[in-house]
């Protein structure tokens, strides 16, 4: 369980930090839930990069 210290009674900031750390922990766990071969990992990384670029270049 991630821990965050509350400084000067700033609970809202501490809560945001906690949520960020907790989501990273969950994401990391899901990423390492099972072993991926090197090539499969590379293809997934390339797919995520393409998706990220398409999202960046969308016109609203």
UniProtKB/Swiss-Prot annotation:
GO terms for molecular function: structural constituent of ribosome. The gene is rpsU. GO terms for cellular component: ribonucleoprotein complex; ribosome. It comes from the Bacteria. Keywords: Ribonucleoprotein, Ribosomal protein. Residues 38-60 are annotated as: Disordered. The keyword Ribonucleoprotein applies. Belongs to the bacterial ribosomal protein bS21 family. This is Small ribosomal subunit protein bS21. InterPro entries: Ribosomal_bS21. GO terms for biological process: translation. Pfam families: Ribosomal_S21 (PF01165). Transmembrane segments: none annotated.
């Amino acid at each position: 369980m991630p821990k965050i210290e509350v400084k000067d009674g700033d609970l809202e900031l501490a809560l945001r930090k906690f949520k960020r750390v907790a989501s990273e922990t969950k994401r990391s766990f899901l990423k390492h839930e099972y072993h991926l071969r090197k090539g499969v990992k590379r293809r997934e990384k390339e797919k995520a990069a393409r998706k990220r670029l398409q999202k960046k270049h969308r016109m609203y």
